[in-house]
């Protein structure tokens, strides 16, 4: 380990497909939480609750999902036919953008915060033709981790983008399943959501706005189950979610987030996976077609 400004940069070697990959992690820690953030994607890979000994962030087991808490940029979701048209030029896109698969630079660190930077490059311009700086900052404050994004347009033309979070919250015990947990949305009696296209070839992964549905809540809560994710994510538009909690089925809070002002919000998991993703999005890709 290399110590930098009272922070520890943990150097891991991971063997992938016969190749050795080095991953650098920055560590934040106080009396309540231990947080690790990777320079790969500026992604939180661990939040450990010292009080009850639980790991809150999904560990990235590829049996279900290889990621932990990716940053989604410059597009949230999937574009129609995986294409994006900008100033008359067509670009091929990937679901949720390229930031999550990019190596960021750690530009600042203290005992309680870390800041990562992704600069535009010739490589990013093959997918997204704008000059930019993307800062992803994490602040450890008591029992909370605060996330801040700063997007700077360093070019001379209007820059279009969306950005979002995709944290996966793992269940506290290994033998727990979705029905052991409830989602709580304070102040809400019901929510409207749309689904993702899972059938048409061109529109696969895009939102279907004409199929709006209602998620009925009881005492602001919804009992998690496998079937709700049969069609992939639930997409909630219209700035419906400002606060969301994952709670044990007896109502005891497990982990929550505040996300005021986000126009869209995603809820997602994988079949039989012991985690659920709560995803505040500042915009998203267009609907199917």
PLM regions: where:
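Beta-strand-rich N-terminal accessory domains
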Residues: 1-86, 90-94, 239-260
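Active-site/ligand-binding surface loops and adjacent short beta/alpha elements
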Residues: 2-4, 171, 175-259
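Extended, loop-rich substrate-binding clefts of extracytoplasmic carbohydrate-active enzymes
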Residues: 4, 16, 89-142
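Hydrophobic residues embedded in beta-strands of well-ordered beta-sheets
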Residues: 26, 45, 114, 145-147, ...
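Acidic, contiguous internal or C-terminal segments within carbohydrate-active enzymes
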Residues: 28, 120-174
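Structural motif
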Residues: 30-31, 40, 109-110, 141, ...
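Buried hydrophobic-core signal for structured, non-transmembrane domains
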Residues: 37, 88, 147-151, 278
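Acidic/His-leaning functional-site neighborhoods
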Residues: 91, 96-108, 217-289
